[in-house]
Amino acid sequence: GDLPIVVNPPRKAKASSDFRFFCDSYFPLTFSLPWSDDHLKVIARIEQAVLRGGLFAMAMPRGSGKSTISECACIWSVLYGHREFVCLIGSDEGHAMDMLDAIKMELDGNDLLLDDFPEAVYPIHCLDGIANRCNGQLYKGERTHIGWTAREVVLPTIAESKASAAIIK
């Protein structure tokens, strides 16, 4: 069948180049407190690195949201096609796996992402939490090639999607 329509095109368009707006709009329960100056600096550096390229290291106190902001940056960068491949690096393998699990939970359970990114998120929702369905999933007669493993996520291959076949590992 057809993909659902985008519920809020203006919101989706604005968030394309505004990482803070993306976080506030699509993760309102996660980012319910006001941003600190340090957070705003980190957000600006992430935005610059994703949109224009580059690397940076982020150091903030424990519990200040480093992992959560990083997870949302991964989602933002692939959904808009800013990046085709994102590598998560945690303090150890377990932490990196936890971060990937958090990203998978958002892609599978965040209704705001489903509303505005049906081309990337709707096929994931159609799996109904059963990863084995990835292999047989079709869209318009073509396989979506979703990857949904413990170590990586491959977003569905959909011709009109900027996130088509993006990888988070």
Predicted regions and their residues:
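N-terminal accessory segments
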Residues: G1-G54
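Contiguous, well-ordered alpha-helical segments that form the cores/surfaces of helical PPI scaffolds
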Residues: I43-E47, T68-L79
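Short, well-ordered loop/turn elements at secondary-structure boundaries
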Residues: R52, H82-R83, A163-A165
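Residue-level preference for the first positions of well-ordered beta-strands
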Residues: L55-A57, F85-C87, I167
